[in-house]
A protein has these predicted regions:
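Noncatalytic, beta-rich nucleic-acid-contacting surfaces in large DNA/RNA-processing enzymes
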Residues: 3-271, 276-277
Length: 277
């Protein structure tokens, strides 16, 4: 609704973030300085593809990855993205963050290019900066590269097409046609610095999940739990699974029911940690 009135309204995006609070609590509980956590820790990186390092694999409710309860990668949508791309490094996670925060960047665009084998993850456009840097690397004039990036990331190319001479310039410098077509589909692109900040925070939290699990779960339920039912959480894995299915199958589930964080609770049972009231 606001997009139809945005030229006449002052809109303030005042976003709250729980992640810094989680980091502080995790540091207090463990004595680990989060800023010293290596962003290439192999065990932590592995949970974005598999849950094996957590002590279980391919759970029927949690799926194949270990990314549940990790910021940026906690939704079914982003976990599906992980399975389509199988990230092996931090740079790829940043690209995925760009995909998820952009508009018309992943579905119907980068995903199809990656799944079909037309392009690798790092060859596709994830963040606005990717366009300018890539076009400059292909030999385009830096000023034109910047203008193309700005027009694409604001959705102007999608709405009105490329300016005269842009497509010809890209073709003259051997920019693939699939790349040009991809640019024309984009409605909005996330800035890379923002994506890097989000993924750094997510990776540090993921490190605690792998290496300091009890502190991680205690912090998660303290900071992020919008609703919590101790009765079934303490009743064992079967009760947790039953509750998950009840909520998923109930089309009239309340907001409180939707917010019951039963999935992370099932993690604690799978990893042999006891939840007690």
């Amino acid at each position: 609704m606001y997009k139809r009135q945005e030229d006449n309204l002052l809109k303030l995006d005042m976003l709250g973030h729980d992640d810094p609070t989680m980091i502080r609590m995790l540091e207090d509980l463990t004595g680990v300085n989060a800023r010293q956590i290596p962003l290439d820790d192999p065990d932590t990186m592995s949970i974005f593809v598999s849950s094996k390092v957590l002590g279980f694999e391919n759970d029927e409710l949690l799926g194949p990855t270990g990314a549940v309860a990790i910021p940026e990668f906690n939704t079914r949508f982003t976990r599906g993205m992980l399975m389509d791309t199988l990230p092996k490094d931090f740079n790829t996670l940043v690209r995925l963050s760009g995909f998820s925060h952009g508009t018309d960047v992943w579905l119907g665009n980068a995903r199809e290019l990656i799944v079909s084998g037309t392009a690798s993850v790092l060859e596709t456009v994830g963040c606005r900066d990717d366009i300018m840097l890539y076009l400059i690397s292909m030999g385009l004039d830096p000023k034109m590269s910047f203008k193309i990036m700005e027009a694409v990331r604001k959705g102007k190319v999608k709405k009105g097409g490329f300016q005269e001479g842009w497509v010809e310039a890209m073709q003259e410098h051997n920019v693939p046609q699939w790349y040009i077509d991809s640019l024309a589909k984009i409605g909005y692109l996330f800035p890379k610095a923002h994506a890097v900040a989000y993924v750094m925070m997510a990776f540090r939290i993921a490190w605690f999940k792998v290496h300091r699990p009890l502190a991680f779960y205690a912090t998660f339920f303290t900071v992020r739990a919008k609703a919590f039912d101790a009765e079934y959480c303490c009743a064992g894995m079967d009760a947790v699974k039953q509750k998950i299915r009840e909520i998923e199958n109930n089309k009239d589930a309340t907001d409180v029911e939707q917010n019951l964080l039963v999935t992370p609770v099932s993690y604690t049972h799978l990893r042999a940690h006891e939840t007690s009231a």
